Amino acid sequence: MELLRQKIENEGIVLSNQVLKVDAFLNHQIDPVLMHEIGQEFAKLFKHDGITKIITIESSGIAPAVMAGLALQVPVVFARKRQSLTLTENLLTASVYSFTKKVESTIAVSNTHLGEKDCVLIIDDFLANGEAAKGLAAIAKQAKAKVAGFGIVIEKSFQPGRDALVQMGYRVESLARIESLEEGKVTFVREVQS
């Protein structure tokens, strides 16, 4: 997605060979025009998959998920990372390790919002090692929901997340695939045109 690549090149900050900071438009300050376009792109990619719900994880996945939900006209459910006074019973849960925060947390979704009749699209802002994605897939599996695929805003292709999800049999659609962050420079995966 060209607009997203431009944003990454112009506003993203490479902090290390592993970390790209995109808080100017994606996961702190949010560019609503970009989010709208991201939602439209995910809707286009998954429009024939019978999506009934989108699931994501709080908080950075919510904006692109809501825009995709709007475009597909389906509800969005987000997994909570923090304990909630109102979310205590009938929970679908999974443990997720965050390499960015160096902490393991339990994510949770109420089983009243996800069930066996659902066909879900899982959306997240980043795909690196795939821990959040696998956690969301585990929650969908507990609900006996079908996973149509993963919509990823930015994929760090040099990390094992995509390969892990593909090996598990999942479809992965990433709007920007980063090959490298070496030497402080973002290098995108060159897509082969057929």
Swiss-Prot record:
UniProtKB keywords: Cytoplasm, Glycosyltransferase, Purine salvage, Transferase
GO cellular component labels: cytoplasm
Family per similarity comment: Belongs to the purine/pyrimidine phosphoribosyltransferase family. Xpt subfamily.
Tree of life domain: Bacteria
NCBIfam families reported for this sequence: PRK09219.1, XPRTase
This protein's record includes keyword Signal: no
Reactions that this protein is recorded to catalyse: XMP + diphosphate = xanthine + 5-phospho-alpha-D-ribose 1-diphosphate
Protein name (record): Xanthine phosphoribosyltransferase
Gene Ontology BP annotations: purine ribonucleoside salvage; xanthine metabolic process; XMP salvage
Gene Ontology molecular function terms on file: xanthine phosphoribosyltransferase activity
Name of the gene this protein is made from: xpt
Binding site for 5-phospho-alpha-D-ribose 1-diphosphate: A128, N129, G130, E131, A132
EC number(s) reported in the record: 2.4.2.22
Pathway(s) this gene product operates in, as recorded in its UniProt entry: Purine metabolism; XMP biosynthesis via salvage pathway; XMP from xanthine: step 1/1
Function: Converts the preformed base xanthine, a product of nucleic acid breakdown, to xanthosine 5'-monophosphate (XMP), so it can be reused for RNA or DNA synthesis.
